[in-house]
Amino acid sequence: EVQSNVKAALKARIHSLRIGGKGAMLDTAKSIPIRELLGQPVVFELEDIGDDDIKAFVIGILLVQLYEYRKAAGGSHQLLGVLVVEEAHRLLKNVPSGEGNNSRAKRRSEDCNMLAEIRSYGQGILIADQVPTKLASDTIKNTNLKLVHRTVMEDDRKCIGAAMNMTPEQIDYLSSLRRGCAAVY
């Protein structure tokens, strides 16, 4: 009975990946090699994928492909490409200990580690999110350059301000930054 339940769950999950926008992206007869994708500017628009878990899964697949490709090419002191991850909390979500399931926390940890390591292979990563507290703390810690625009919520200001080694006064000032102004660390 357990085996049939697992089979049914897997079939349902795989079937859901084969329909709609996900199906057009994942269930194809011909794919584009990662080498070709990285040879030009490319945008992966995932708006049609409504489920955050599926978005994280697709982004994770792309990230693993990118990581393995750069790793196989060897280390580089030259910037070979930049990956921009908007609304990064979908991939690098802050899951407080005790919440969520272990596989999600493990996956998030692996993604954070991959992002930290991939820089040594010449890959730049730009992590963008409007709510710092939604991001895994390792993501914030592992970024080399931090840029923050006006941030109103106190918990978000404290989170990013601490990562930027700001004084309490500087953290408070983040709520009054004008449009186009930012703090950089």
Annotate each PLM feature.
Residues 106-185:
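Conserved ATP-driven motor cores of ASCE-family P-loop NTPases powering translocation/secretion/packaging/pilus
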